[in-house]
Amino acid sequence: MPAVRPVVAVAEPLIAFRDVSLSIGGHEILRNINMTIGKGEFVCVVGPSGCGKTTTLRLIAGLMKPSSGTVTYQGKPVGAPRQDIAIMFQDYGRALLPWRTVAGNVSLAMESLGTPKAERAGRIDELLAKVGLRGQNDRYPNQLSGGMQQRLQIARCLAQNPAVLLMDEPFGALDAMTRQALQDEVLAIVAATGATVFFVTHDLEEAVYLGDRVVGLLPHPGRVAKTVSVNLPRPRDQLTSRETPEFLRLRRELFDFIKEAEA
């Protein structure tokens, strides 16, 4: 069962979108996005295809810049990518370096931080144990299952000691049991580290299970249309939490939102 962590107030946002719009090649992608994310908060983003979920994540990461408005981190405009913001993608096949071992992929993040070589091995062992990959150091990504490759991505992200985890549908390609196991691992890691999470997903149940809040976007152009607070107690459980009346109510509310958006 995931560890307990405090409910977070959003009085002083760690990340803020202020009237953010984005157009590319004359095509309007986002319009007037206003959104805040508090330190230690777990925010999930849902919406139909084409609503800009991944684009908002890339703006936080500093991989894109808005056409107008501002995205701020710790009160300052986001510029280039930062070491304390880690990104985890769904396509683990492209995210991992196939010519590096499991340990080598985790080491990459430490190398970029300038961690002395003598200090890396112990930290790598610690991180691999934390994500359930103890003893897998010398294997290569193509020797791992999809779930194990995603665990490796998590370990590599944690090697950056990130304050923020940006997760772009990381479990969408996995089977149901593996997906739920990784959901619980992420919740446990977040509880232990206090990291802030911005999590993009198409899975409404996943959004309710993981999040403190769920933000719903509408498409063409992408814009914020709904924000739902998730007041389910933590730690959450894959069986009992999902069977509560509040979980079912929130899932239905989000389902109706998506259904109406796609009508």
Walk through the language-model features, giving the residues of each.
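Conserved ABC ATPase "signature" region
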Residues: S107, E111, A118-Q136, A188
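A short, proline-enriched helix->beta-strand linker immediately N-terminal to the Walker B motif
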Residues: A159-A163
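Helix-to-loop junction immediately C-terminal to a conserved catalytic motif
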Residues: A61
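Conserved ABC transporter NBD signature motif
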Residues: G69-P81
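The feature captures the beta-strand-to-loop junction immediately N-terminal to the Walker
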Residues: V46-P48
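Catalytic Walker B motif of ABC-type/P-loop ATPase nucleotide-binding domains
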Residues: L165-D168
